[in-house]
Amino acid sequence: MLETGVLVIGGGNAGCAAAIASARHGARTTLVERYGFLGGTATAAMVGPWMTFHSGGDRIVGGIAQEIVERLMAKGASPGHVADSSDYVATITPFDPEVHKAVLFEMMREAGVELLLHGYFLSTETVGDGVTGATFATVAGSRRYQATVAIDATADALVAHSAGVPTQQGDERGRVQPASLMFRLSHVDMHELARYVREHPDQMRTSLAPGQRKAAALTAVAGLNEIWQAAVRDNIVDVPRELVSIFASPYADEVIVNMTRVVNINPLDPDDLTRAEVEARLQTMQLLDFFRTRVPGFANSRIAATGTQIGIRESRRIVGRYTLTADDVLNARQFDDAVARSAYPIDVHNPSGSGTTTKRLAPGKSYEIPYRCMVPVNREQLLVAGRCISTTHEALASVRLTPTVMTLGQAAGTAAALAVRSGSMVGEVDPAQLRATLEADGVDLRRT
């Protein structure tokens, strides 16, 4: 058995931020990831751009998340935060997933995080109410770790579920949001697309005047309704989407396509997950044909990359010491133990068909997420970070976005390191001390 101070299971964006924060605060930290790279949905599923670091004109996400963006910018792999030309959020943050993988490895080395890649979680070890370690499958057999604190950053609450933490899934009928496989198209003539949306001003959701719709300004295009509906009628596509949804990448002739949709799935059922992967890749080929034959500027486009796996919006959520609700989100609620802020709307993609329901905060407002959402109701020395924290189905539709989960990860790693240093339980970490430490590390917890 190997020993560590803080054991982070899952090397996605939440897990990476947790491991970096923990190690920077002096805890011996081990991160175990199932793939041969880090980044989770941002790299394995290529989910991007990141949405959103801002509420109106104010940046509300900082810390490690902002540091990652600045490192990507320094490598020419992100333009930083740019205005969302589709008016869905204030800003979006395009990035290159391949460079993001390398940036995360650099940050792990600098912080002194011990890595185990290609490690597949099998089970937890508990003593009384405490989680004391975990076992993983590796190419050389099983490997056990004993830890003072464990952080579940698996996105599916695998560790918490194994440890007997109560969980919930989906809406009141158990339905979860659909899954989507992201892909990138290169060799795109953005000037031709811009010309089309200038000449057809009602075919794009935007506040940009037609004359402002230049290629460089089109960071996101949502619409092209007439083109899409005609393709559906002509049986070019059979995808349960209501509009075209594409985003600019860091590179001038490339776009990110977020349009595949596999409905009626349970992402924790391996057969459903298999079906979703197959259906999404077949949808991708339909969409490639659609773009080449119907959308101006895409005649010579090629698939530059697809996600290693399909993107999952929702699976398990733990029951924590507090459950964040839709009312908390929409009313911009504040908490004494808040560790993160977000202004992303509640957007629920229809679990069984096309359409998306969106509920927004008041302009310029943001809500807070309390530390208690990461602390299981019945276990000690275990924290949960990422989309599987304690929320309702609707609240999760806002919380799940990458900038937010990176901040939650930083909070979890910081709290774990504080607990190791003081010899306390994670549920006993002083919220005021945690908040002060996070703010000193660049996390924006200001109140407006």
Roles of regions detected by a PLM:
Residues 41, 141-149, 153-448:
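Flavin (FAD/FMN)-binding glycine-rich loop and adjacent Rossmann-like elements that form
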Residues 21, 27-28, 33-123, 127, ...:
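Conserved N-terminal/central alpha/beta ligand/cofactor-binding core
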Residues 1-12:
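Beta1/beta-strand and adjacent pyrophosphate-binding region of the FAD-binding site
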Residues 125-144:
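Conserved beta-strand-loop-beta-strand element in the redox core of flavoprotein oxidoreductases
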Residues 15:
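N-terminal Rossmann-fold NAD(P) dinucleotide-binding loop
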